[in-house]
Each structure stands twice: as C-alpha cells, then as structure tokens.
Amino acid sequence: MSIRVLLFSIFTGFLLAAAGPALAQGSRIKDVASLQAGRDNQLIGYGLVVGLQSTGDSLRSSPFTDQSMRAMLQNLGISTQGGQSSAKNVAAVMVTATLPPFGSPGSRIDATVSSLGDATSLRGGTLIMTSLSGADGQIYAVAQGSVVVSGFTAQGQAATVTEGVTTSGRVPNGAIIERELPSKFKDSVNLVLQLRNPDFSTSLGMARRINNYATATYGAPIAEARDSQEVVIQKPRTADLAQLMADIENLVVETDTPAKVVINERTGTIVIGADVRVSKVAVSYGTLTVQVNETPQVIQPQPFSSGTTATQPQTDISAQKTGDKVAIVDGPDLRTLVAGLNNIGVKPDGIIAILQGIKSAGALQAELVLQ
C-alpha cells in the first residue's frame, strides 16, 4: 500500500502534506530504523582559515585569532616577535564533522567550518590542519582543505550586498579519519534496532516481519519488540552477522505514525499529517485592515512677504473589514478540511489561529506541535 501525498498551497508560505484515505505505508527497515551499535558520533575542533581577501578577523577585535596564528607560526619554527599584523586574511573557526558508524582509518568525511570572530566572509579561504576530537577527548580525524561557501558578499564604499551566509562553509571530503571507534558489532549476541519515529504498531509489525523471515530461514523467531522504539534481535548461532543484517534491513514493513499538525509561526508554514481528523465545527473568520497614508502639502508664502516655504501634514485613514464568513468544517479527511478553510479565504496567520482554536475546542483529533 502507498500513501498519495498531495501538496496544497493556499497562500505563500502555507504548505499542507496531505493524503487520501489513511493507509499503511510499506517501507524498508533500513529507512525507518537504525542499528543501536552503528550510531554517528560528533567531532569538533578549533582551527584557522587563511588566504582570505581582507574578509578575515580584525586581530584587535579577535585577540584569540592573533594568539592562534602566533602559536601556529612558532610551531613551524617562525619567529613572531615584533609588531601586530594588520592583515585581515586569517579567521578563527570552529570545525565540526560527523564520524559515521564503522568508519575506518583513511576514509574521508565532510567538515563544516564556522567563523568565531568578526570575519565577514570565508570565501576563497583554506582550512589548515585541524584536529577533530570526540566527546572523550581523543582525536579521531584531521581536517584540511579549501572552504566552499554558498553565499557571497559584494562591498563598495557606500553599500554592501550579502546573499546567503558567508561566515560558514564546508570542506568536502576534507577530514581524514585517523582512528576508528571501538565496535562490538562482530561480537554482539543481541542487536537492537531503534525506530526513528517511535510507534508501538510499527515496532510490533517489524518484529513480526523479522520473525517470519527468521522462521523460514533459521527455523525459529529471533525478534522481540521491547517498546515503541526498540526491537531486540537475537543472533542465530549459524548466522553470519553481516549477512543477517543485510537481509533484515531490506525487509519491508508497514509503518504507522500518530496524527500531527506541525505549525511554524515564524514562517507561516503548516504541515498536516495524513491521519488528521476534525470533528464538525463552525469557524468564523474576519479581518480588519487599516490603511494610513501621509501626504504632506507644500505651502508657499505670499509674494514679497519675506516668508518661508513650509509643509503641512495631511493624514488619510481608511479602514476596511473583510471576511466575517462562517464555514462548517467537518474533516473526515484532509481534503474536506482544506476545502472548508478555502471557503472562508483565510491567510496563513489566520489558519494558524483557526487550527489552535479548533484544538482548544476539542475538535482536532491530532497532536498540535508549535515550532
């Protein structure tokens, strides 16, 4: 079975993820769950980006950049005694990366750099050798390479134009893994699959699907749903662990998720899940628009009166009330809900207020998530 996803755009910034009749969706286990023993790990480090075109840190405003540059040069055997440099071609940055599960020494991962000081752009810079450490303080990777920045800045004597973010960027494949995390995958007796979206129905369905496969292959069930998020798998004695996981992660299970409505009040974005239901409710919507226009009038003095030209303010205020429509919204499915809101011509901010009111009235059969 598959869900048909429909996108409804009522006004700019209003998005609805919808569906026809709510049906269970078939997904591979690898797409809905991850192996507990194979999780990612975060790495962090401090470094310098050099080669900037006068867009780096001001060494007076960012003393840590000057200290780091001097320490680096001293480590290279270069004397730093003398006056302070006024060049702005160096920037202090924080470097982050994600160490994937089972990452082996010598393989490469992406690194992200973010400015710490008052640099205006990292475009054209090069990250010099930076050690990346884990939460245990051990060094797991070393990053170095050219920084790729998506935004740009154009500056003149009287104006500056900036598009996107220029104070952060990426070093594609710029970090080399030097140490792998200790892994007990090969020695594991029990494996734990963790659902990315915890749900009892999905967890039990996954355990049943794995047991059907195991019974046909090994002659006995091997999986048990521990709770809404975890499914425990016991390794058969004759099974190769890598082959077992390769077979299990490609099994297709029917997934289920609770009904949710997610609202981002800053952007006016609304996402409504497929299983959202609305009980019969009446909605009234109206808006008051007030427009204020300032049109100053120029008053000229009389001839030979030695007067001066003056301006007299003139304000025109108009008010218009729109809406005041009442619609009966009864949502056996999402299409009916969208049609009901369209009938009264609501805008994104009005839709947010209406959904909050419907939830308060107890007519929205879903979880309302505000971001």
From Swiss-Prot:
Keyword Phosphoprotein among UniProt keywords: no
Region ranges (Disordered): 301-322
Name of one Pfam family that matches: FlgI
GO function term, MF aspect, one: structural molecule activity
Signal peptide per UniProt: 1-24
Keyword terms, alphabetized: Bacterial flagellum, Periplasm, Signal
Compositional bias annotation for Polar residues: 301-321
Subcellular location: Periplasm; Bacterial flagellum basal body
Keyword Signal: yes
Major localisation: periplasm
CC per GO annotation: bacterial-type flagellum basal body, distal rod, P ring; outer membrane-bounded periplasmic space
Domain of life of the native organism: Bacteria
GO biological process: bacterial-type flagellum-dependent cell motility
Subunit: The basal body constitutes a major portion of the flagellar organelle and consists of four rings (L,P,S, and M) mounted on a central rod.
Family indicated by similarity: Belongs to the FlgI family.
Record's function text: Assembles around the rod to form the L-ring and probably protects the motor/basal body from shearing forces during rotation.
Protein name in UniProt: Flagellar P-ring protein
Origin species: Allorhizobium ampelinum (strain ATCC BAA-846 / DSM 112012 / S4)
